[in-house]
A protein has these predicted regions:
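N-terminal leader/targeting and accessory segments in enzymes
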Residues: 1-109, 113
């Protein structure tokens, strides 16, 4: 099973980390039923300078909203954070309790997909 917005949200929820999903300016408890949310991420990064088409960005540490400037135009697919950045980017957000733990889980899923 590839890492998509839906599988990432399910994984984070199963581990008690997911608080909310922000999608199309709506807050919800799960990813809506939209085929576009089943497109696999091309990469996971926590460095905004490396975001490219299809990237999942994990916002951790001393992350600042201004780091997100221009990322929609570079292909940001979604972000994981403990803060809502929907005022800065259009990409869906997975709001979690601990972005570092979330990074560990989704990175493992990308490198070792579930069967």
């Amino acid at each position: 099973m590839p890492l998509t917005l839906r599988t990432a949200a399910r994984l984070l929820s199963d581990h008690g980390l997911l608080r909310e999903v922000i999608h199309d300016d709506r807050w919800m408890m799960q990813v809506p039923d939209d085929p576009a949310d089943d497109v696999p991420f091309s990469a996971i990064t926590y460095d905004t300078r490396t975001v490219g088409g299809g990237s999942l960005l994990v916002c951790k540490g001393r992350f600042r909203p201004e780091y997100l400037d221009g990322l929609d135009g570079r292909g940001l697919a979604a972000y994981v954070a403990d803060t809502d950045y929907s005022a800065v980017v259009d990409a869906p957000g997975l709001i979690v309790d601990d972005p570092r733990k979330a990074l560990s889980l989704v990175a493992r899923l990308l490198s070792e997909p579930l069967e």
